């Protein structure tokens, strides 16, 4: 669980997402409240439930990006899923309880990796000893303990010399035959949608077949060390403890980001068979409110899992959701459409902005891209104009505009004489001016 303050979380999000202060503030407070709850004494702690968030805003303004960045900051079990993947129980498709099962699987994987990393030093020592045993097999006869200790001392000296060479990488390319755990039997099982848990159990049965067997492999010492280190680290990790900690982390600190919630809202003007849209909403109700989900790792309570939902709601409204589900998301945040100034910031001020990405890509072929301020401004204006004239797809429009702008440069990169390209307003107008002015062309090309 992260111990960052709301200000620090917002500051971190600012490096990647432009504007949307209200949304950033809401998720930062929600994330900090996870830590605050953990500091409260036990009787009251159980009564403090998370306040779920609904983010409303047009496409391409940063809703999903906030989720992606939040996943890295949370340091807690986190899953991002699309509401459109699920169907009502009884229909063909995935039911909503698989959200929690997937969250548990991800948490266990994350906890196991962390536990193996903590055991890395001990595992490396054990792997080193196994390699040395292969390089210098010890011959111990029946009178080993009665023999002169000089031979043992000589062996130890030789072993230390080889250990030094091994650590300095002098033996990396030498090939050795090592005994490693044989891979478990992999079986691809195709099951009807909604029966993922049964499939996992059957696959687990197949994987246990042949477990513990050894297999001889010829590898370079560098590869063998890595393989043996992973094997030794896995031996040192207590799987039961990992599963127990992961389940506890999911129940107490889990976060589910539910994207595209608007797509399962039933629009008032729609009639006919509305296949399971309302059914999915009804199935989500107990999950969001707090229920117990059966998984292969035991029963998981969802009472303290934080749900953050988002949707564009351009064809439907939040009020089109069933009232019970609306009540489960007490905090509502509206995200703003992007302005020309926002587009400029996206192109220049974020940590991995598009201009830097294209500069780095073309630099690999010796082409130096230089973006001038008026060129950036013109790019932002064109992206904004096309959004206004056609469909508003937010910051995603910049990808289309940038690709079209640098199409020829990307194609000709590597040619003799093409080593520097200046992107100013004149260059942007030459490449994109006509397309932006012609609404029919921009509708299909930009």
From Swiss-Prot:
Q: Name one Pfam family in it.
A: AAA
Q: Which GO terms describe its cellular component?
A: HslUV protease complex
Q: Where does the record locate the signal sequence feature?
A: none
Q: Which GO terms describe its biological process?
A: protein unfolding; proteolysis involved in protein catabolic process
Cellular compartments annotated = Cytoplasm
Please provide the record's keywords in A-Z order. Answer: ATP-binding, Chaperone, Cytoplasm, Nucleotide-binding, Stress response
Q: Which CDD domains match?
A: RecA-like_HslU (cd19498)
Q: Where does ATP bind?
A: 18, 60-65, 259, 324, 396
Q: Which SMART domains does this chain map to? A: AAA (SM00382), ClpB_D2-small (SM01086)
Q: Which InterPro entries match?
A: AAA+_ATPase, ATP-dep_Clp_protease_ClpX, ATPase_AAA_core, Clp_ATPase_C, HslU, P-loop_NTPase
Oligomer and partners? A double ring-shaped homohexamer of HslV is capped on each side by a ring-shaped HslU homohexamer. The assembly of the HslU/HslV complex is dependent on binding of ATP.
Tell me, what does this protein do in biology? ATPase subunit of a proteasome-like degradation complex; this subunit has chaperone activity. The binding of ATP and its subsequent hydrolysis by HslU are essential for unfolding of protein substrates subsequently hydrolyzed by HslV. HslU recognizes the N-terminal part of its protein substrates and unfolds these before they are guided to HslV for hydrolysis.
According to its UniProt record, which protein family does this protein belong to?
Belongs to the ClpX chaperone family. HslU subfamily.
Q: What is the name of this protein? A: ATP-dependent protease ATPase subunit HslU
Organism this protein belongs to: Dechloromonas aromatica (strain RCB)
